[in-house]
């Protein structure tokens, strides 16, 4: 079942999994997120009333030793409160690695970013430009980029799935941002799905460019299941960009051959394509080598945090 928590380390030598994409939000925002997912996922079993404790219990049931907790304001006026929420929440959760966020209308983006990094101890910042309804790489965001570049910190940004969202991202601006802020580590969340040829080139050209394969692994497995039966597509598959996936198919596998040390694997938990055991099965469907699997599950995260000056964050994990 896709929606059952359970162990992901079933054998003693199974790799630990650092989940780089979790959303524990305030109750009102959590309920709104679940309601949104239910609009396009018939039978989605997660309750709108799911609590932080329930999310955390499932994460722990699935043997997740660390996770990135990601927030982002939909309105400017919730920015400071949302970042304080993440600070207070994660202060009591040793597994949590918090990220902050800003809104395009946040008056002092540099100041809020500095507060998140220097005062709250956050690892970096996150934007979801499609949900927040503003461009991620315009000049308005430069104050945030400058602080992240100064501190060598990561910027996680939603990329890809343009057809599903009915929106467009300027990928030339994204590349310019990677180039202009070489000490800021830019993590393309969802790996600009399905533009794998592009991200392969960016990984080759820019050492500060990284991928998080959240949802993209599951979508590629879905593609494998339905590519020969396009007249009977399941919910959501109509926006899978089948033709583009086919054109980028070989490049998907080249990513793991050439750059596994900069590719991570998050889940969007609890509103992704399933709970942790099912999403681990999606990864293993492709039969990657043990070394590649270890990179995706925890070693690439360690590489990222080490690049950001925090090599000891995951030091307790075996194999680091």
Predicted region positions:
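Mid-to-C-terminal alpha-helical segments outside catalytic/metal-binding sites
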Residues: 1-20, 29-66, 115, 250-254, ...
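Divalent metal-coordination and catalytic microenvironments
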Residues: 21, 67, 86, 98, ...
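Alpha-helical scaffolding within the catalytic cores
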Residues: 50-56, 81-86, 109-112, 171-174, ...
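Histidine-centered divalent metal-coordination motifs
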Residues: 21-27, 158, 190
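Short, electropositive alpha-helical surface patch
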Residues: 79-91, 182, 209-210, 279-287
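Active-site gating loops and adjacent loop-to-helix segments of metal-dependent hydrolytic enzymes
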Residues: 14, 23-51, 62-65, 206-210, ...
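Catalytic pocket-lining loop regions of alpha/beta-barrel enzymes
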Residues: 123-124, 137-264, 318-320
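Active-site gating/metal-coordination segments in enzymes
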Residues: 66, 74-169, 218
